[in-house]
Amino acid sequence: MKKLFIQFYLLLFVCFLVMSLLVGLVYKFTAERAGKQSLDDLMNSSLYLMRSELREIPPHDWGKTLKEMDLNLSFDLRVEPLSKYHLDDISMHRLRGGEIVALDDQYTFLQRIPRSHYVLAVGPVPYLYYLHQMRLLDIALIAFIAISLAFPVFIWMRPHWQDMLKLEAAAQRFGDGHLNERIHFDEGSSFERLGVAFNQMADNINALIASKKQLIDGIAHELRTPLVRLRYRLEMSDNLSAAESQALNRDISQLEALIEELLTYARLDRPQNELHLSEPDLPLWLSTHLADIQAVTPDKTVRIKTLVQGHYAALDMRLMERVLDNLLNNALRYCHSTVETSLLLSGNRATLIVEDDGPGIAPENREHIFEPFVRLDPSRDRSTGGCGLGLAIVHSIALAMGGTVNCDTSELGGARFSFSWPLWHNIPQFTSA
């Protein structure tokens, strides 16, 4: 609100200031023109008075004579020697030319008496002093108006700002996965129509997600059913050799794995994910899981590099198992002989690291490997197995848990994947669509 208030207030104040300056310039031009005319008339009248009243009096007695005259003026009118005033060259030239010269610091005007070394001095003039004071008053008035403008601007902006905060909070909650979030503004609010549009958008997104879920469930049923029938018929067939039967079973298993990965990715790639939280002994779970992996892959070395004991807060172990399996499968697929795993605990974050001694991943490709169906050539392609969704699923799980996943170079020479997540107990729990 502070930034918006300052922007709007400055715009309003600058517009007001420009208009005031324009009006002031017009007024100043008019006032100065009228004042100059009045001053000329005053000086001419004074000179005429001097010619008529002081004609027979010597110049050195003019000042004394003027003092004795009762002119009933609000300012002094006196005759003084020109040498009394130390003027700059420009002012002196103007004065000798018969022009009126103003002494701003003394609020006095001077005009040379023709054919003499005397000047007619008028002042101090109260009007000039008043004009000087008016300048100070103008500055004070502008400052007062500037302060006065801030109050109505704040009063006008406050309800709008509250509605904006309300809309921002609703949009933030909706973006965090609370898809039932709706917003309602008071009748007459400037944001009422925007609130209606937001609610319509939310309803449409909810309907789209529900339709997507229904489509995924339908695809799962329609694809799995013929695969089950195909596997059953394959088992019942006597016309295939053992090698052919084994090859077909392998192809069917790959199709089933691909379907399962696609469905898993589709379920994760949405703003709502139902997290089933528990507080397991994560170091024990990791040790047990790696022992099982080592048992089924005796030709590779799968070991723990670093294991930090501690409390790892609440986790969805179903998702954590998928993360570990996908990272280990990826490492085992491309390693030469060794895969190392670490579990670290630092402050309010935990990190699961899986690294291998394989060919590694070039820096320019590390941002793209978490996209679905991305394969890297020549060492990481379809010939090594997999469907190209494993790391994309890991990335989606990281987003669901409020964490991150990245890739860099391992000390073993291959790729090093780091899956990091916050240790907050308030990990967002979303309701399923």
Curated annotation (Swiss-Prot):
It comes from Escherichia coli (strain K12). It is a multi-pass membrane protein. Its EC number is 2.7.13.3. The modification Phosphohistidine is found at H276. Residues 25-135 are periplasmic. InterPro entries: 2C_sensor_his_kinase, HAMP_dom, HATPase_C_sf, His_kinase_dom, HisK_dim/P_dom, HisK_dim/P_sf, Sig_transdc_His_kin-like_C. Member of the two-component regulatory system RstB/RstA. RstB functions as a membrane-associated protein kinase that phosphorylates RstA. The gene is rstB. The chain crosses the membrane at residues 4-24, 136-156. The keyword Transmembrane helix applies. It is found in: Cell inner membrane. This is Sensor protein RstB. One of its GO terms (biological process) is signal transduction. GO terms for molecular function: ATP binding; phosphorelay sensor kinase activity. Autophosphorylated.
